[in-house]
Amino acid sequence: MIRASKVHGQYHWKEPAADTVVLDFDDRHRRRMAMTGTRGLSFLLDLEHATALRGGDALVLDDGRLIEVVAAPEPLLEIRGRDPQHLVRLAWHLGNRHLPTQIMAKALRIRRDHVIADMVRGLGGKAVEIEAPFDPEGGAYAPAHEGAAHHDHGGHEHRHHDHGHHDHADHEHDHKHDHGKHDHAGHDHAHDHHVHDEHCGHDHGHGHSHKHDHK
């Protein structure tokens, strides 16, 4: 089977594509995977490291032909605030839960999650269910690949994470903050941690409860 072992960055290519692959967020985070294009061309994605592909990238086959990557629509939540300051506050809460987030001009997009939707609405924001391609921000320290702001994951493979479901059983993080006269008793800082499935390339074992007593 012919291989695709290189990636041309987002729209940094001019040649016509021999075929197209339509991939969701999970399948755009692969190192090695057999694929078939929409026109029937089968090939093996065989990259040196797991790479975050984006819509508009091109996979380079061994014979020089290109396969265009198209981001598939998937179930998302579009989050809006009352004003820019409120939207930034909502973004902080999403970041506190380590959720992949796509930043729009006046909105945020995350993978659909009913727990997070309820949280956003409880904070006064809007959370609307949509179907759209998902192109979240990459890591702040991620190197680029060939003209685009893509990252690879060094010597270890980060497969996709399922952020659609949150397991509240095994990840009990009871963060109790005692800051002098500041009483945080009414605030439950529960972190909705994502489930790491079989595609995660590293062990995230959290078998203990984290309690932080800041005096």
UniProtKB/Swiss-Prot annotation:
Belongs to the UreE family. InterPro entries: UreE, UreE_C_dom, UreE_N, UreE_N_sf. Involved in urease metallocenter assembly. Binds nickel. Probably functions as a nickel donor during metallocenter assembly. Its main location: cytoplasm. It is found in: Cytoplasm. GO terms for molecular function: nickel cation binding; unfolded protein binding. Keywords: Chaperone, Cytoplasm, Nickel, Nickel insertion. GO terms for cellular component: cytoplasm. This is Urease accessory protein UreE. Residues 134-215 are annotated as: Disordered. GO terms for biological process: protein folding; protein-containing complex assembly; urea metabolic process. Residues 164-206 have a biased composition (Basic and acidic residues). Disulfide bonds: none annotated.
